[in-house]
Amino acid sequence: MQLSAHTDLIGDTTVISFSGELDLSTLPKLSDVLTQATIEDHKRIVLDLDGITVLDDPALGLLLGFAARLRAKNTSLHIVCTSQNICSYLRRTKLDLIIPIATSVSDITK
């Protein structure tokens, strides 16, 4: 399965919407997208995972590294997730204690 990403700017928030699978086979694409977002100067970044069907441990590790890089730049990171399977995985791994999770982009950009 492929991974696609689309970036939008909503006020001072950059929203990166993903669809497909975040797994070992799509890590290079995920890494490229996140690296580009790190290079640019953002106040807040939202990763919209609503279109994601699979999220594995290597992809989770990449997201954690991305969160650490953004924290060093004083950029906040948020995740949008409504898929029961993906959200449950994020909570089981305690990612929600590191990166805030919301159910919609508008909840974050208010």
Predicted regions, residues:
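Short acidic-hydrophobic, aromatic-tinged amphipathic segments that line or gate anion-handling sites
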Residues: I99-S104
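Amphipathic alpha-helical interaction surfaces in cytosolic regulatory modules
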Residues: L24-I98
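Short alpha-helical segment
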Residues: D107-I108
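STAS-typified acidic loop motif
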Residues: L3-D32, L49-G51
